């Protein structure tokens, strides 16, 4: 039987930290410590060294790839004799709950927007495309929130299709982690960006994963470059529990929070509840739906202890 390592060796070029860091070349570090502090996720210790060693080489790679796509578009439009439509380059970032997808997305947005070739970089999370809380309850999906069936896929695909087509003023629904629900009558307007980053649990899912066996368009069909943020499950579970404890004294303390009833839990109670949530929801979703899509990514960022990147895999 072919091992996972041999599959990775066939599909990907592997780089350790020092090898990857060398590929930065002369790309300058444009972030300072206060700016980085605003981009960090809960319970993450992201340093400027991590940005320099991991994210600057990735920023350089993406800039080269986006530039090549833009040049190809110019050639095609010249051949067709048409005015080039403004269509964004779409980057997706997938991975488990608590792996740090949102931080990766924010860092890349900040770095990519510094390149003169593509100054406008928008970021959208798929959380806004979860069915509203009332609809999840009606469908009996509240305990499967984050699973593929808990998303309004028709709305999500229509959104990314309109963005990819170069349409102006495309609306993306917003999500509140306080109310644990989609925000009514509010949205993020996407106005023909140079690059769109879309971040979510299931953005690498394809028609092959359809439960009904019918081929249909998915987010991955519209993506130009995909990134998967990876880590061992024991680390993911630990990070989830640590984050839950942080939220208990932070967001959960807000009386409007859907999880306010967790705010006064003792440490042991909070850890037990968080572990149960992982074992019953997040862990199964990871194994069934998220992790199986990993090897579809163009690039895999593998994290080790303390959220530090240990290896980068780049598809050949």
From Swiss-Prot:
One CC-aspect GO term: cytoplasm
NCBIfam families per record: panK_bact
Alphabetized InterPro entries for the sequence: P-loop_NTPase, PanK, PRK/URK
Top EC group: transferase
Pathway: Cofactor biosynthesis; coenzyme A biosynthesis; CoA from (R)-pantothenate: step 1/5
Amino acids binding ATP: 95-102
Keywords in alphabetical order: ATP-binding, Coenzyme A biosynthesis, Cytoplasm, Kinase, Nucleotide-binding, Transferase
Family according to the record: Belongs to the prokaryotic pantothenate kinase family.
EC number: 2.7.1.33
GO biological process: coenzyme A biosynthetic process
Keyword Nucleotide-binding attached: yes
Catalyzed reaction equations: (R)-pantothenate + ATP = (R)-4'-phosphopantothenate + ADP + H(+)
The protein's name: Pantothenate kinase
Cell compartments where the protein resides: Cytoplasm
Record-level Gene Ontology MF annotations: ATP binding; pantothenate kinase activity
